[in-house]
Amino acid sequence: MKTSHLIRIALPGALAAALLASQVSQAADLVPPPGYYAAVGERKGNAGSCPAVPPPYTGSLVFTSKYEGSDSARATLNVKAEKTFRSQIKDITDMERGATKLVTQYMRSGRDGDLACALNWMSTWARAGALQSDDFNHTGKSMRKWALGSLSGAYMRLKFSSSRPLAAHAEQSREIEDWFARLGTQVVRDWSGLPLKKINNHSYWAAWSVMSTAVVTNRRDLFDWAVSEFKVAANQVDEQGFLPNELKRRQRALAYHNYALPPLAMIAAFAQVNGVDLRQENHGALQRLAERVMKGVDDEETFEEKTGEDQDMTDLKVDNKYAWLEPYCALYRCEPKMLEAKKDREPFNSFRLGGEVTRVFSREGGS
């Protein structure tokens, strides 16, 4: 009887402790992996002139698909359509690449002019309400989430640097972060509620942009959405490590499996440092996918058997396409062969992941 009484007393106490721990976890500020706290480099010389800000894109996000006219596999580029597409999105991609480059320059050089220039670029677009149009198609909403991931990922290095470079720029920081929050909320609307047959690498990249925005703006709701999208993705990975919706890309199936990995590895790495371990989701789906891709890079025969097509290896010859190896090997004890593949291709720099991926995932905290 005494034991039973003690159990009745202990259980509510344990439950209360668990609830309190949960509340503390929920209240904790969101953080990036340790490398994002790296100090700004020692000042080297004077900054050059600040390039002109690309005109803020405030128009309709209805763009031509570079696969226009292709069959359901969406694997054959339409050269004429691609040229039109590149012309339509030039200001957006100039912004992504240019702002990321300016942040990288500042983190390396410590020149105040580079910081002022980067913040001017971003705050100009923020004040204009760029990329917020409600008039969009699939290609347009894809550009919105890619740009958000690029810009918020680069800005994150400024936000969390131990040098506190944003301390003297509170107003611009607020404008930029409010803009990111608006875009993040829109990206969630854009990519929520899709049927499983429509959820592919685009949704994964949307989830990465929302995860990056969540950490920059300390928005737990955005963080939770990104984690939930990761879980959907993980449960699309089959027992052999294939993504059925990417196998539909036929001759580009292997390339698209590889393209799915950067956002998923980044989300998992960011979730991990915020107390959410996604490595075992669907019995280690991320690891199965990564290993399947690297085996395919060595020998594409399995992908050829699955798709009935010779694989287009063009993208897979570009080192930066493997930038996912940095967050991935921060999560897992990578086998020697994978570590060698990573080392051979480093340093990784991907503007869609915010710039210097190798630097922010280095053991030395970015040095």
From Swiss-Prot:
It catalyses: Eliminative cleavage of alginate to give oligosaccharides with 4-deoxy-alpha-L-erythro-hex-4-enuronosyl groups at their non-reducing ends and beta-D-mannuronate at their reducing end. It comes from the Bacteria. Keywords: Lyase, Periplasm, Signal. SUPFAM superfamilies: Chondroitin AC/alginate lyase. Its EC number is 4.2.2.3. It is an enzyme of class 4 (lyase). InterPro entries: Alginate_lyase, Alginate_lyase_dom, Chondroitin_lyas. One of its GO terms (biological process) is alginic acid catabolic process. Substrate binds at S65, K66, H138, T139, Y256. One of its GO terms (cellular component) is periplasmic space. Residues 1-27 form the signal peptide. It is found in: Periplasm. The keyword Lipid biosynthesis does not apply. One of its GO terms (molecular function) is poly(beta-D-mannuronate) lyase activity. Belongs to the polysaccharide lyase 5 family. Catalyzes the depolymerization of alginate by cleaving the beta-1,4 glycosidic bond between two adjacent sugar residues via a beta-elimination mechanism. May serve to degrade mislocalized alginate that is trapped in the periplasmic space. This is Alginate lyase. The lineage of its organism: Bacteria, Pseudomonadati, Pseudomonadota, Gammaproteobacteria, Pseudomonadales.
